[in-house]
């Protein structure tokens, strides 16, 4: 028995010596992995600090906070609430803070203390933890152990993340190479719960511990594994190692691993610590171990994983199994993947914050730009339409007087019998008429006559007004609807209590036109005139004794009242009051509109200042942070691209070949070195536009970006943009010769691409031969979106290639029609079938000479081979007036028709074919 124990111990010592060098090698590999992690963590931390500073500046600027640098905007919170709402979401901010502050920690779990100790010794080198024999394992009661970095070797008992316990340890009594077992075990007679839960904290001047802590879980009899993870997992970056010292997992092991998977969802590095035959998971023909099958059933592994732990097809679990302890250095690969996963997740969250807020800025810039353009037009439109309405109503009042007179006479004639009948049957209010027909007093007679008059006037009023409204109702559709909507929009954006005065005056104008009945029911001239006529009736009737109130009497009174009404006087009075009221309302409307215009003038001035600030400061600054976070995400996921041979040079960068990157091949890599802060911000903003565009078959795909901080030996920083690589550009294609049908199809492809950009609100600004790439089937894609910008974000800068630049580009005020102009020039080359310069441009000695000639109207000449319809399309596209250029939605069907006529019929134009 003694010989067997000695032999076993000897084998264990030999195994430890064999793995000692592997452990030191693994420690160095781990160190390199943590250096890689720390390098990119530092960049993430810097980006997060800059992001928090950006949001803090935005909050101070637009919240109206005391001492804010821009207090002139403090009162604009309601108008610019969208900017005020641009904040760092609390949930994302807390997550990112925790991620960048968390220190990596390796948790060593396992079936028993022997396996856990062997892994710890393998990582740290030497025999820090004693390796127990099989008999000792059964009664082991080890406490939790935590290894930390320190300038000198120290051992102490401490409660996790709290305080150190005063306790005399055996290790304090002298030097040691292996931690005494008495300090590792929890005494069976220990009654103090703090001492039973305390962990053994070991500080060592070990290089690996500078980057990571190591926690060895206690024996199950001392504390559950879940408690160890629960104490740490929320504030560390967890790397979980599970030491397997038996041939297979026990039922208790499986339950423990199931709990870890369900509760913490952490990947696990499984490693065998016993001396077994080589069992690498990647053996293609070998028999899989029982342990491997158990881990698949538990969901930690999936079939299709290679021995390096890389995921196979459909694999989502990054856990890893190594069946040789000598391969412990593979923990470096595993830990790098785990830490990289944390960095990628954080970079994705941070970039989502950047992109979401940047889109809000761009959308707000669109709103402000539109407001600056549309508000003056709305004011002018409202003024013009109100004038037209006023003049139309005045003309109506002039010519309607005679019509009103005829209308009143016609109405009275048509209603006479009905009015008389209604008057005869009328029941008086508040007047008691005796049943026997006895006469009533003069006062009561007067009241009866009043009520008969009210009946006649109300019926006449209703009939006349209905006919008058129908005669002018067309004005409602012609003027009122659109004008009212314009006013509502103008008053909505003018946040003042008196903002609805203009609408009220407009309503008065409409009231004068459509509600004429007020002139009958108020103390107006018409009413007084009618009253005078009624008084005359009363005087004729009441100079004798009071009459008997009978139906015949009521009918006679109504008859006299109707006959004494003057239709011409009524019509004249109606028109006079209508004109007077209309003029008063028109003058009040003009005054209130002027006041509204003054209010908008001040508001638009602030809007313009804010628009400039968003376009020149806020959006570019945030875009740079977005570029950095997205590039960090790309380099972590796909690595730094390998630069191949040079393909070409442009004004702002060099294009290289790149065999493959991020699963894409072949690729092209454009290296851009921004010379200053402005170019950095412009590049970042343009990169955001490119990344935001949906994929389209007529645009070259942008795969990703990487920021190279070591470019030029570290003297400068370069942005590497990785795109798909195509066969050649259109310039080379025309030089080598292309058929007519191919060239026209290329033109259609370019139009489709430009049309898509314009539909996305983006202007390319540099359409030319070298920015149209061709695949092997001669289908075209637009590239070099470096000058692309939404119209609302354009500063008016002069960009592009001189030959293709529209005249208005030099003024700084332009829109997406500059792309239509550039296409017209491009189409000239396509139809000519060559790359020879037009004569008008070839004669120019310099760019300035060329620009001056273009401004004066110089355009390419018509070649004899040109089809008439093609030439007309070119001329329309390069029209000097941007508003006269056709939209791409019009160009596309025209071009398709040309292609069908020239290429798909028997009467194919040979002239154009001759140019190939």
UniProtKB/Swiss-Prot annotation:
UniProt lists compositionally biased (Basic and acidic residues) regions at 1-19
Keyword list (alphabetical) reads: ATP-binding, Cell junction, Cell membrane, Cytoplasm, Developmental protein, Kinase, Membrane, Nucleotide-binding, Serine/threonine-protein kinase, Transferase, Tyrosine-protein kinase
Q: Which residues bind ATP?
A: 647-655, 670
Look up the domain of life of the source. Eukaryota
- Per the Swiss-Prot or TrEMBL record, the active site comprises 766
Kindly state one GO CC term assigned in the UniProt record.
apical plasma membrane
Region Disordered: which residues? 1-27
Listed under GO biological process in this entry are:
cellular response to fibroblast growth factor stimulus; embryonic organ development; negative regulation of apoptotic process; positive regulation of ERK1 and ERK2 cascade; positive regulation of fibroblast growth factor receptor signaling pathway
According to its UniProt record, where is this protein located?
Cytoplasm; Cell membrane; Apical cell membrane; Basolateral cell membrane
In the record, what terms sit under GO molecular function?
Answer: ATP binding; protein serine kinase activity; protein serine/threonine kinase activity; protein serine/threonine/tyrosine kinase activity; protein tyrosine kinase activity
Mainly localized where?
cytoplasm
Annotated family: Belongs to the protein kinase superfamily. Ser/Thr protein kinase family.
**Function, in words:** May act as a positive regulator of ERK phosphorylation downstream of fibroblast growth factor-receptor activation. May induce both caspase-dependent apoptosis and caspase-independent cell death. May play a role in the embryonic development.
Protein name per UniProt: Dual serine/threonine and tyrosine protein kinase
UniProt organism field: Xenopus laevis (African clawed frog)
Q: Its encoding gene is what?
A: dstyk
């Amino acid at each position: 028995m003694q010989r067997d124990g000695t032999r076993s111990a000897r084998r264990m010592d030999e195994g430890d010596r064999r793995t000692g060098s592997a452990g030191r090698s693994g420690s160095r590999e781990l160190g390199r992995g943590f250096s890689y992690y720390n390098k990119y963590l530092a960049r993430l931390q810097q980006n997060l600090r800059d992001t928090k500073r950006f949001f803090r500046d935005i909050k101070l600027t637009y919240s109206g906070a005391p001492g804010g640098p821009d207090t002139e905007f403090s009162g604009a919170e309601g108008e610019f609430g969208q900017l005020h709402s641009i904040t760092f979401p609390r949930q994302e901010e807390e997550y990112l803070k925790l991620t960048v502050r968390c220190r990596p920690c390796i948790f060593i779990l396992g079936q028993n203390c022997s396996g856990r100790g062997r892994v710890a010794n393998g990582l740290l080198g030497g025999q820090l933890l004693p390796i127990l024999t099989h008999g000792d394992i059964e009664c082991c009661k080890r406490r939790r152990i935590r290894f930390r970095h320190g300038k000198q070797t120290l051992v102490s008992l401490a409660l996790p993340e709290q305080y150190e316990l005063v306790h005399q340890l055996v290790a304090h009594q002298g030097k040691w190479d292996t931690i005494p077992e008495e300090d590792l075990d929890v005494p069976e007679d220990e009654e103090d719960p703090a001492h039973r839960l305390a962990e053994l904290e070991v500080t060592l001047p070990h290089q690996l511990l500078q980057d990571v802590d190591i926690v060895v879980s206690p024996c199950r009899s001392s504390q559950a594994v879940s408690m160890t993870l629960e104490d740490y997992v929320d504030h560390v970056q967890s790397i979980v190692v599970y030491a397997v010292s038996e041939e297979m997992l026990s039922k208790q092991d499986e339950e423990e691993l199931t709990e870890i998977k369900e509760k913490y969802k952490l990947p696990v590095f499984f490693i065998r610590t016993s001396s077994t035959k080589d069992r690498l998971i990647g053996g293609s023909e070998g028999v899989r171990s029982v342990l491997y099958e158990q881990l698949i059933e538990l969901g930690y592994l999936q079939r299709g994983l290679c021995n390096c732990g890389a995921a196979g097809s459909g694999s989502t679990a990054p856990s890893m199994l190594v069946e040789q302890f000598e391969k412990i250095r593979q923990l470096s690969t595993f830990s790098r993947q785990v830490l990289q996963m944390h960095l990628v997740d954080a970079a994705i969250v941070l970039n989502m914050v950047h992109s979401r807020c940047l889109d809000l800025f761009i959308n707000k810039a669109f709103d402000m730009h539109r407001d600056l353009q549309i508000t003056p037009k709305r004011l002018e439109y409202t003024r013009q339409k109100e004038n037209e309405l006023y003049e139309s109503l005045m003309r109506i009042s002039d010519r309607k007087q005679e019509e009103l007179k005829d209308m009143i006479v016609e109405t009275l004639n048509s209603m006479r019998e009905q009015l008389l009948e209604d008057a005869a049957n009328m029941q008086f209010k508040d007047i008691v008429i005796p049943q026997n027909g006895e006469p009533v007093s003069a006062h009561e007679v007067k009241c009866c006559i009043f009520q008969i008059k009210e009946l006649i006037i109300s019926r006449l009023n209703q009939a006349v007004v209905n006919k008058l409204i129908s005669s002018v109702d067309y004005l409602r559709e012609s003027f009122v609807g659109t004008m009212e909507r314009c006013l509502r929009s103008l008053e909505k954006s003018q946040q003042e209590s008196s903002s609805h005065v203009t609408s009220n005056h407009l309503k008065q104008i409409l009231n004068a036109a459509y509600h004429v009945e007020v002139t009958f029911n108020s103390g107006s001239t018409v009413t007084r005139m009618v009253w005078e006529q009624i008084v005359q009736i009363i005087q004729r009737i009441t100079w004798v004794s009071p009459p008997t109130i009978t139906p015949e009497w009521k009918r006679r009174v109504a008859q006299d009242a109707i006959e004494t009404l003057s239709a011409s006087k009524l019509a004249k009075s109606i028109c006079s009051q209508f004109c007077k009221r209309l003029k008063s309302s028109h003058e009040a409307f003009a005054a209130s509109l002027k006041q509204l215009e003054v209010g908008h003038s001040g508001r638009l001035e602030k809007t313009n200042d804010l628009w400039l600030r968003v376009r020149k400061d806020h959006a570019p600054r945030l875009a740079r942070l977005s570029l950095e976070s997205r590039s960090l995400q790309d380099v972590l996921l796909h690595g730094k691209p390998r630069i191949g041979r040079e393909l070409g040079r442009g004004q702002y960068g060099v294009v290289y070949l790149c065999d493959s990157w991020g699963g894409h091949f072949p690729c092209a890599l454009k290296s851009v070195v921004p010379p200053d802060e402005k170019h950095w911000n412009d590049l970042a903003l343009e990169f955001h536009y490119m990344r935001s565009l949906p994929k389209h078959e007529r645009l070259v795909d942008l795969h990703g970006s990487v920021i190279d901080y070591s470019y030029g030996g570290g003297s400068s920083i370069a942005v590497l943009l990785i795109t798909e690589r195509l066969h050649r550009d259109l310039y080379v294609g025309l030089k080598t010769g292309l058929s007519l049908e191919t060239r026209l199809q290329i033109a259609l492809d370019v139009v489709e691409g430009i049309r898509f950009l314009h539909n996305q609100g983006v202007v390319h600004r540099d359409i030319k031969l070298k920015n149209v790439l061709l695949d092997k089937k001669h289908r075209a894609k637009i590239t070099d979106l470096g000058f692309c910008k939404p119209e609302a974000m354009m500063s008016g800068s002069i960009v592009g290639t001189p030959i293709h630049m529209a005249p208005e580009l030099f003024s700084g005020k332009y829109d997406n029609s500059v792309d239509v102009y550039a296409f017209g020039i491009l189409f000239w080359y396509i139809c000519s079938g060559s790359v020879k310069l037009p004569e008008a441009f070839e004669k120019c000695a310099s760019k300035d000479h060329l620009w001056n000639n273009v401004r004066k109207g110089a355009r390419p000449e018509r070649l004899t081979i040109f089809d008439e319809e093609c030439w007309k399309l070119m001329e329309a596209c390069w029209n000097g007036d941007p508003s006269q250029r056709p939209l791409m939605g019009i160009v596309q069907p025209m071009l398709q028709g040309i292609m069908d006529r020239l290429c798909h019929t028997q009467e194919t134009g040979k002239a154009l074919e001759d140019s190939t």
